[in-house]
């Protein structure tokens, strides 16, 4: 009876009813009068129903072992003209009745055929249809580090938070491959940095800390990953720190120290999102002498950073609120102070890095250009070398880094 009800829900486009039935563990891989649920959805060209069914372990090729499709085969062959002709003749562009449940867009992504991907998307291919393994085209592009393909899919609003059959989002896949560039692209396009996958029971941050991927942890923290967020696993609540300490992980890794540093930072700046999460984290920290020592050292380092100011802004505030960042010339004039804090920082280098890079690059560009100009202008026709150092510096502050570099090379 439930099977008939599912078929009726598909027939009438009742997504909520179909989802309720699938949640009650109905196996969608059956046929009635030669039609499986997925074949019905494809026949009706109901893309949302197709996506729903494919996300519940549907195998479109299970009952059709000798399946063939002119459209899919033309895509595999890279035959753009034939694909256009088939689409013009009415072939369904989001058809999953093929090997492994792949749509034409999946196949174009697998072969990294960017022109074919563009064509299919322009003709209405949905970027978020999962295949049998629940891989969307974005999952596949991330797996193969196809930067151009990833950019194309993200430009067309491919969803960044869909789980595959292993419970992994594209962000978790990119993180597991150590691919900082792709992680950045996904985060820029809206990937949820705190997305909790129930199947592997991890977030991207948890995975990064577990594998001590320092660059990833640094980027996630800078992007706002929440160290005090509470997740529910098997009806039990956990924070990232609790999960890490429950895994086969070295609790003395640099990545764990960075997590502790973020917990201390959120307390210091009064930006705790969850009192419950913070309380649970502090219970763990206070139970381990080394973690407690790290936490106390973090507070000392934060006080030191917060005690230093540039004009009316303390440096910690400048690091935390980029909108308040000062003009790069002002930062350059205080580069020694900023670089001194950066060099002496143990736990908060990731926080100071952008400020330190901006200050040092600008200061070096001005000083380097001044040295070159001083050496090249030896006569007194311009009176350049008569000017005090401060006046020269003020003049060069009006010139951008790129132009200063060009001037230095001439």
Curated annotation (Swiss-Prot):
InterPro entries: Ankyrin_rpt (IPR002110), Ankyrin_rpt-contain_sf (IPR036770), PRANC_domain (IPR018272). ANK repeats lie at residues 33-62, 66-95, 100-129, 133-162, 166-195, 200-229. Keywords: ANK repeat, Early protein, Repeat. Pfam families: Ank, Ank_2, PRANC. It comes from the Viruses. This is Putative ankyrin repeat protein FPV240. It comes from Fowlpox virus (strain NVSL). The lineage of its organism: Viruses, Varidnaviria, Bamfordvirae, Nucleocytoviricota, Pokkesviricetes.
């Amino acid at each position: 009876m439930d099977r008939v009800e599912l078929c009726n829900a598909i027939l009438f486009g009742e997504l909520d009813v179909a989802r309720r039935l699938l949640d009650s563990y109905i196996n969608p891989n059956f046929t009635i009068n030669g039609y499986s649920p997925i074949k019905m959805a494809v026949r009706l060209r109901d893309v949302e129903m197709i996506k729903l069914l494919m996300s519940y372990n549907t195998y479109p090729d299970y009952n059709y072992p000798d399946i063939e499709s002119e459209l899919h085969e033309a895509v595999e062959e890279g035959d753009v003209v034939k694909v256009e002709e088939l689409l013009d003749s009415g072939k369904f562009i989001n058809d999953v009745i093929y090997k492994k449940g792949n749509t034409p867009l999946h196949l174009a992504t697998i072969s990294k055929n960017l022109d074919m991907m563009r064509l299919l998307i322009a003709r209405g291919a949905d970027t978020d249809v999962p295949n049998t393994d629940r891989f969307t085209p974005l999952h596949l592009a991330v797996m193969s580090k196809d930067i151009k393909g990833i950019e194309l899919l993200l430009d067309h609003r491919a969803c960044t938070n869909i789980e595959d059959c292993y419970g992994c989002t594209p962000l978790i896949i990119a993180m597991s491959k150590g691919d900082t560039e792709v992680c950045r692209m996904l985060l820029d396009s809206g990937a949820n940095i705190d997305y909790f996958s129930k199947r592997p029971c991890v977030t991207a941050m948890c995975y990064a800390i577990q594998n001590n991927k320092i660059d990833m942890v640094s980027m996630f923290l800078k992007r706002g990953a929440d160290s005090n967020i509470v997740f529910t696993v098997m009806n039990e609540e956990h924070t990232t720190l609790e999960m890490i300490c429950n895994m086969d992980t070295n609790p003395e890794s640099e990545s764990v120290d960075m997590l502790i540093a973020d917990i201390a930072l959120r307390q210091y700046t009064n930006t705790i999102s969850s009192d419950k999460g913070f309380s649970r984290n502090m219970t763990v920290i206070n139970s381990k002498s080394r973690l407690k020592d790290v936490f106390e050292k973090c507070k000392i380092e934060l006080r030191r950073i917060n005690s230093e100011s540039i004009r009316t802004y303390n440096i910690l505030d400048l690091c935390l609120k980029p909108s308040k960042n000062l003009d790069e010339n002002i930062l350059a004039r205080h580069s020694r102070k900023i670089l001194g804090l950066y060099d002496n920082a143990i736990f908060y280098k990731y926080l100071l890095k952008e400020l330190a890079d901006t200050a040092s690059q600008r200061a070096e560009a001005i000083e380097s250009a001044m040295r070159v100009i001083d050496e090249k202008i030896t006569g007194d026709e311009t009176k350049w070398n008569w000017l005090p150092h401060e006046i020269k510096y003020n003049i060069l502050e009006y010139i951008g880094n790129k132009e200063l570099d060009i001037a230095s090379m001439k």
